[in-house]
A protein has these predicted regions:
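Generic structural signal for well-ordered alpha-helical scaffold segments
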Residues: 71-75, 167, 171-182
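Acidic, low-complexity terminal tails and accessory targeting/binding regions
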Residues: 2-37, 128-137, 179, 183-196, ...
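Active-site-proximal alpha-helix that buttresses catalytic centers in soluble enzyme cores
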Residues: 13-17, 21, 36, 45-109
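Phosphate-handling substructures
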Residues: 103-172
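Short, hydrophobic/glycine-enriched beta-strand segments
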Residues: 35-43, 200-201
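Short glycine-rich phosphate-binding loop at a beta-alpha junction
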Residues: 82-89, 185-192, 197-201
Length: 250
């Protein structure tokens, strides 16, 4: 897909009837698109993960031994260049990022040399409200909970976040990626270069919903992100709310 994208972008630019003087910025060309690789990482294991408790905005850290758990992912990402790094502002994600992309790599340019990681509240897990910290067994006899299990788009946890609000903040995050990606290429550059990579350290529900929003045929349960697991998505941005994506094998 990377080669096809580069070839298509090259053809679109070379075949433009405009002269060099008349060429316009990318964002004024309605037929163009912008490409990137998203690397979506779920945080490492917490106590509540181990106890199978709902954990939304509660701010728990990782269990002891997280460095060992995340070592394979750290080795996978070592030396990869990221144009941007985004991270949920909750502790479990911040600690995960510190392990998989150590500060020494950031300052040395091993993984990122131009920008510090951005802490992003829009990448938080769904807020479960009063159900945060509870297990299925604690809630299974609550009628509202059972209704929420069947129709989370219609039911909101008490004191929690509606599904609409959850989806909207993720859509706004994707739109901000589009705006940043367009701004990268106000003038044509090397159209055969690989698309930039963006690292996103976030939560299982966020990864599921982003894949559901981006990839045709995916629903919320198509993925089951494990703690410390990464998913790579080749993403084409054709405009606000207009995305084409493909999950890469891993």
């Amino acid at each position: 897909m990377k080669q096809d994208i580069a070839a298509k972008r090259t053809v679109e630019y070379v075949q433009s009837p405009n002269s060099q003087e008349d060429k316009v910025p990318y964002d004024a060309k309605e037929d163009l698109h912008w490409d990137m690789e998203l690397v979506l990482v779920r945080h490492g294991t917490t106590l509540w993960n181990k106890e199978r408790r709902y954990m939304g905005h509660s701010d728990l850290g990782l269990l002891p031994g997280a460095e060992q758990e995340l070592k394979p992912l750290q080795e996978e990402l070592q030396g990869q260049s990221f144009a941007r790094i985004y991270c949920s502002d909750l502790m479990r994600c911040r600690q995960t990022l510190q392990i998989i992309v150590p500060e020494s790599e950031l300052t040395s340019g091993g993984s990122l040399s131009t920008m510090s990681p951005m802490m992003e509240p829009r990448l938080r897990e769904l807020h479960f409200g009063e159900w945060d910290g509870k297990t299925y067994d604690m809630l299974k006899d609550v009628s509202l909970y059972r209704a929420w299990i069947d129709e989370p788009q219609r039911i909101t946890p008490p004191g929690g976040e509606s599904w609409t609000d959850f989806v909207n903040r993720l859509r706004k995050f994707l739109d901000s990626l589009y705006e940043w990606r367009v701004a990268m290429e106000v003038q044509p550059m090397d159209l055969t270069a690989a698309p930039p990579s963006v690292l996103v350290v976030t939560h299982g529900g966020v990864i599921r919903q982003l894949a559901c929003m981006l990839i045709p045929g995916h629903d919320f349960w198509s993925l089951n992100p494990k703690p410390g697991e990464a998913f790579r998505i080749q993403l084409r941005l054709a405009g606000p709310h207009n995305y084409i994506a493909e999950m890469l094998p891993h």
